[in-house]
From Swiss-Prot:
This is Somatoliberin. PROSITE patterns: GLUCAGON. It comes from Mesocricetus auratus (Golden hamster). Its main location: secreted. PANTHER family: GLUCAGON-FAMILY NEUROPEPTIDE, SOMATOLIBERIN.
């Protein structure tokens, strides 16, 4: 019998090499936990980065709003004046049309 066949038989008959070690399920669980932990840390990092970016953007928006505050108020006042002017013009036009209609119906 060749020597290598003897070593193969010896290896196969030894129980510790033939059957999976009892720590294999533990290793698989640890591997799965490591994958989960790694993915979870990535997600937490992305959430933190997103929150930081939103905070920075809201601060910048707040600064812009403070700078634009007087301009916005002035714009609203101008819009209000135009609306009042338009309403007065429409009321004048409507009054003129009513007068013309009453003259036409009388005559």
């Amino acid at each position: 019998m060749p020597l290598w066949v003897f070593f193969v038989i010896l290896t196969l008959t030894n129980g510790s090499h033939c059957s999976p070690s009892p720590s294999l399920p533990f290793r698989i669980r640890r591997y799965a936990d490591a994958i989960f932990t790694s993915s979870y840390r990535k997600v937490l990092g992305q959430l933190s980065a997103r929150k930081l970016l939103q905070d920075i953007m809201s601060r910048q928006q707040g600064e812009r709003n403070q700078e634009q505050g007087p301009r916005v108020r002035l714009g609203r006042q101008v819009d209000s004046m135009w609306a009042d002017h338009r309403q007065m013009s429409l009321e004048s036009l409507l009054a003129a049309l009513l007068q013309k209609h009453s003259r036409d119906s009388q005559g």
